[in-house]
């Protein structure tokens, strides 16, 4: 009976460790995926800012020259 309790305790202990390791790995993967999304948004912000500034500078002159009312 004592050896059976020992083996059951060992199985329970190893199962608990296995579950905690899987949970840590899953959390790390989620953080990795979340970090990529944040990086994509940051790159988009960096990319769109200068383009919008250029468009606001070029667009009025293009319209003016296109309509020939300058």
Curated annotation (Swiss-Prot):
GO terms for biological process: antimicrobial humoral immune response mediated by antimicrobial peptide; defense response to fungus; defense response to Gram-negative bacterium; defense response to Gram-positive bacterium; killing of cells of another organism. Keywords: Amphibian defense peptide, Antibiotic, Antimicrobial, Cleavage on pair of basic residues, Fungicide, Secreted, Signal. Has antimicrobial activity against Gram-positive bacteria S.aureus ATCC 2592 (MIC=2.5 uM), S.aureus ATCC 43300 (MIC=2.5 uM) and B.subtilis (MIC=20.0 uM), against Gram-negative bacteria E.coli ML-35P (MIC=50.0 uM), P.aeruginosa PA01 (MIC=10.0 uM) and P.aeruginosa ATCC 27853 (MIC=5.0 uM) and against fungus C.albicans ATCC 2002 (MIC=5.0 uM). Expressed by the skin glands. This is Gaegurin-LK2. Residues 1-22 form the signal peptide. One of its GO terms (cellular component) is extracellular region. It is found in: Secreted. InterPro entries: Frog_antimicrobial_propeptide (IPR004275).
């Amino acid at each position: 009976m004592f050896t059976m309790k020992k083996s059951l305790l060992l199985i329970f202990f190893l199962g608990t460790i296995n579950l905690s390791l899987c949970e840590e790995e899953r959390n790390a993967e989620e953080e990795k995926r979340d970090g990529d999304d944040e990086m994509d948004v940051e790159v988009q912000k960096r990319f769109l800012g200068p383009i919008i500034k250029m468009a606001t500078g070029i667009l009025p002159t293009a319209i003016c020259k296109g309509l020939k009312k300058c």
